């Protein structure tokens, strides 16, 4: 059964995560910061890592852009959870496809492993990421030949909805894609819980 926790900003929804998954102490996480490595603003990477560690989780970092397929395979398979940070979604997708990590992640999720997707990590679960090019630059993924993504859900998660500095951009995307694809906007204080075919959006009050 599919277990996905999708968010815009993990550090801002930690109570929602512990509601979604309570058995955390001593569990291990493969932490993938790859999307952030081509960005200038990266504070959310350390913030996400610290939030995980504060819950008693053991974090093992994996940059899929620089590791061998053997190392990627080992880390994805041995740890209990998979966490993919924010950053540039197109670069992330390019590296997932180039290394074959996309298929490995799908295999692990199909086997029941919990996937935590933050911002770009949530966007790549969509069928196709073309909708996010208003927010993310495609120029950081010159070798990406198409925008077909992990296709784990039948909607397109739009992170940071109505949050600074993305307020205008996110509203523009919602307007632009109205009727074309199912855009699922979430703010920094919301998360999407997915268990099997059940999809629930929750918000911190």
From Swiss-Prot:
Active site: 119 (charge relay system), 160 (charge relay system)
Matches recorded under SUPFAM superfamilies: Class I glutamine amidotransferase-like (SSF52317)
Top-level taxon of the source organism: Bacteria
Pfam family, one: Peptidase_S51
InterPro entries found in the cross-reference section: Class_I_gatase-like (IPR029062), Peptidase_S51 (IPR005320)
Sorted UniProt keywords: Hydrolase, Protease, Serine protease
GO biological process: proteolysis
Molecular function GO labels: serine-type peptidase activity
Catalytic activity, EC: 3.4.21.-
Keyword Hydrolase recorded: yes
Keyword Metal-binding (UniProt): no
Similarity remark: Belongs to the peptidase S51 family.
Protein name: Uncharacterized peptidase Lmo0363
Species of origin: Listeria monocytogenes serovar 1/2a (strain ATCC BAA-679 / EGD-e)
């Amino acid at each position: 059964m599919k277990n996905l926790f999708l968010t815009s900003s993990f550090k801002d929804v930690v109570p929602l995560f512990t509601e979604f998954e309570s058995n955390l102490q001593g569990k291990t996480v493969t932490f993938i910061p790859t999307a952030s490595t081509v960005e200038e603003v990266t504070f959310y990477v350390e913030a996400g890592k610290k939030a995980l560690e504060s819950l008693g989780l053991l974090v093992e970092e994996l940059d899929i852009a620089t590791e061998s397929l053997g190392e990627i395979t080992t880390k994805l398979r041995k740890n209990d959870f998979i966490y993919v940070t924010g950053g540039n979604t197109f670069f992330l997708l390019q590296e997932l496809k180039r290394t074959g990590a996309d298929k490995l992640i799908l295999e692990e999720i199909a086997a029941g492993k919990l996937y935590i997707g933050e911002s770009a990590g949530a966007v790549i679960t969509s069928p196709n990421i073309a909708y996010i090019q208003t927010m993310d630059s495609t120029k950081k993924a010159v070798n990406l030949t198409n925008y077909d993504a992990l296709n784990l859900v039948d909607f397109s998660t739009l992170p940071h909805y109505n949050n600074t500095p993305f307020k205008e951009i996110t509203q523009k995307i919602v307007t632009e894609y109205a009727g074309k694809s199912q855009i699922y906007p979430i703010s920094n204080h919301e998360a999407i819980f997915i268990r099997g075919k059940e999809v629930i959006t929750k918000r911190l009050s």
